[in-house]
């Protein structure tokens, strides 16, 4: 979701032998239509804290549609719904102060549903990095109940993805050997 998260994820992928490909101009143009002009215009895609479900879905699906993209890591997800639930518990929070958090929670939950739907639609792994991997975040709960496992660090997500790639290559090699 933000630049620092993306750089960490990209570096972790490369460390684990995964390729983070450049994006074709057509994909960059499509993403540029929904992000502010100052976004990084590259991979990793930095959504510059633009937080609405339609924008994030467009970015995610633009990547998933590309034959050169085998998976997507979404980093920096899940904390809004947690804070939306926790802040109202504070004796210092007024109803007016908590209302924006409820709206953001709804957006984040919609994003979680979009991630789950896109994983099925495109049949590509989508890994999510979040500080909250338990059940303390309603959006992370949505992911977990739909088969999207959260990772606590970009390094863990990249390592898991690397192992998945190794497993797929091993299966392909065995299939080819049989033929």
Question: Which stretches of residues belong to each language-model region?
Answer:
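Short glycine-cluster motifs
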Residues: 1-100
């Amino acid at each position: 979701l933000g630049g620092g998260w993306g750089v960490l994820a990209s570096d972790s992928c490369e460390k684990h032998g995964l390729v983070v490909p450049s994006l074709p101009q057509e994909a960059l143009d499509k993403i540029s239509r929904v992000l502010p002009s100052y976004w990084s215009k590259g991979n990793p895609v930095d959504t510059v804290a633009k937080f609405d479900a339609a924008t994030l879905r467009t970015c995610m699906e633009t990547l998933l549609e590309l034959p050169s993209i085998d998976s997507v890591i979404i980093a920096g997800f899940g904390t809004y719904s947690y804070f939306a639930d926790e802040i109202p518990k504070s004796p210092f929070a007024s109803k007016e102060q908590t209302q924006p958090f409820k709206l953001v929670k709804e957006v984040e939950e919609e994003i979680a549903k979009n991630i789950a739907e896109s994983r099925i639609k495109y049949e590509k792994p989508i890994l999510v990095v979040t500080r909250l991997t338990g059940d303390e975040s309603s959006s992370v709960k949505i992911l977990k109940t739909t088969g999207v496992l959260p990772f606590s660090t970009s390094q863990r997500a990249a390592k898991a993805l690397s192992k998945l790639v190794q497993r797929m290559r091993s299966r392909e090699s065995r299939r080819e050997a049989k033929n």
